[in-house]
Structure formats: structure tokens, C-alpha cells
Amino acid sequence: MKPKKEIRPKLDTDRIDDAVLALMYLTLHDGGRAWKGFDWETTNRLFKKGLISDPVSKAKSVWLSHEAQARSKQLFEQMFVVKEN
């Protein structure tokens, strides 16, 4: 008997990309670099969108464009900061 093939739901990759970009805000350093310890498919999509430098390198971090730096801060605050009343 063949093992059942796992059925994965269709993923919203734009939302995943936003979440990763928001998390990159936590590790921003040296004027715009962030650690690249995220899923390769996601970092490749961010690269293709022009938001980060090419993740395929020996460097352990990627450069975020000015647009990506601003967007990562905005997304981080939107997703993870508790709003005080």
C-alpha cells in the first residue's frame, strides 16, 4: 500500500514574506544588515522583490534596502508591539 501523500494548504507567501521581514527588524545591525537565518525560499522571494541583497553568499547576513528597512519596522510594530490604551 502506498503511503498517503500529505496535502498542504495553499500558503499566502506575501504574508510569510511580511512576517520574515518584520522578524528581520529584530536583528538589524551595521546600518541595514540583518541575519539571514530564515527559510531559503522566503529569502529568495525577498531578494527577487528587491528588498534584500542576494542571500546566496557566505555572509551570515543580508543587506536590507532603505524601503525594506522602513517596511520591516512598520511590519514589526504592526505585528508584534502591544498597543497601550
Indicate residue ranges for each PLM-predicted region.
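Hydrophobic alpha-helical segments
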Residues: 16-19, 65, 69
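Minor-groove-contacting beta-hairpin "wing" of winged helix-turn-helix DNA-binding domains
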Residues: 59-65
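Short, amphipathic alpha-helical interaction segments positioned at domain boundaries
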Residues: 66-85
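N-terminal acidic leader/helix
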Residues: 3-37
